[in-house]
Amino acid sequence: MHCAYFERGTCRSCGWLADPYADQLQRKMARCQSALTGLGGVWLPIVPSAETAFRNKAKMVVCGDASSPCLGILDADDDGIDLSNCPLYPTAITEAFEPLKQMIRRLGIPPYDVKKRQGELKYLLITVSEDDDSLMVRLVLRSDIWIERLRADLSTLTADLPHLAVLSVNIQPVHQAILEGEQEVILTDRETLTVHLNGLPFHLRPKSFFQTNTRVAEQLYATARSWVAEVAPVHMWDLFCGVGGFALHCADVIPGQVTGIEISAEAIASAQQSALELGLKNVSFHALGANEFIDQAVSLPQMPALVVVNPPRRGLGVGLCAFLDESVVQTVIYSSCNPESLARDLVMMPGFELVKAQVFDLFPHTAHSEVLAMLVRVR
């Protein structure tokens, strides 16, 4: 992939970009295998990505001033670097940058100055649905004083940006490296952005977590579904389920109950909306932390034979690993964005062995990757 920002040295977010893509894949495979050395298992071929225009989400720091805004990143001196032509983004996102800059200029919204600790607009977050190029745009502001002016400008912005489906404001008042605050105000009639994966609808709300590489995510979920079908359990849990990616994909191969658990109430609302639209009677979603759920699960009349887990980078942790290891669960399908924490968790579950694993390149040109692993009980 050719990137003028990388060649000039102004942006090094894609740390592996100097390496040919085939070499990147080999390095990722070797890194993941090395992290899980001695744990057994068969490694399936790595699933590659498109090299450009694969990201469905842009997180842009807003810099400069209201008359000349800059969308991109901060350098080491907290000065802005405009990345409006970043090749990671599809056309629908890159074409949205100029209308959004025009809106900032039109309303005179001052970008937040990190060094001076003053200003209002901190981030622009843009998500695209590859279904129809519709967009969800979030403005992260220091205060709510611009909300009514943004609402009054909505018809103008929509005329300039006809693919806009959802516009929201997030209030993040503190001077800290925190992306978003608690308060979210949606300014459009629509509250969700619809994205289809493998024909299944997902309704994204502004705070919903969603994999940033749509096409590779489809392959991740399809592979997990095929592995679940191989095991053919009666019931299944999906822990850290987000908007229901694994649960919804697996529902048609589970004759019993599929239960999704996720701490984010907003993500659970999205998952429930998808299940209702699909007419799924055997799927339920609950807004609970995974550890809170397992505290309640010990009293349930039946445990599933299979559990899917997709924890954050830190992994499952001691408590959840111990619960799974001591339970009657026979198979764990573990989706991990951190092979080191995956390896730590496997060591803490000696009752299971790694049967197979596959790397999915959700994050090209970086050291990051997603590993899907099947663990089967041996004692």
Curated annotation (Swiss-Prot):
Tell me the disulfide pairings in this chain.
none
Q: Which PROSITE patterns match?
A: SAM_MT_RNA_M5U, TRMA_1
Instruction: Enumerate the residues binding [4Fe-4S] cluster.
Output: 3, 11, 14, 86
Q: Which GO terms describe its molecular function?
A: 4 iron, 4 sulfur cluster binding; iron ion binding; rRNA (uridine-C5-)-methyltransferase activity
Xref: SUPFAM superfamilies = S-adenosyl-L-methionine-dependent methyltransferases
EC numbers listed for it are 2.1.1.189
Instruction: Describe the family membership recorded for this protein in Swiss-Prot or TrEMBL.
Output: Belongs to the class I-like SAM-binding methyltransferase superfamily. RNA M5U methyltransferase family. RlmC subfamily.
Q: What is this protein called?
A: 23S rRNA (uracil(747)-C(5))-methyltransferase RlmC
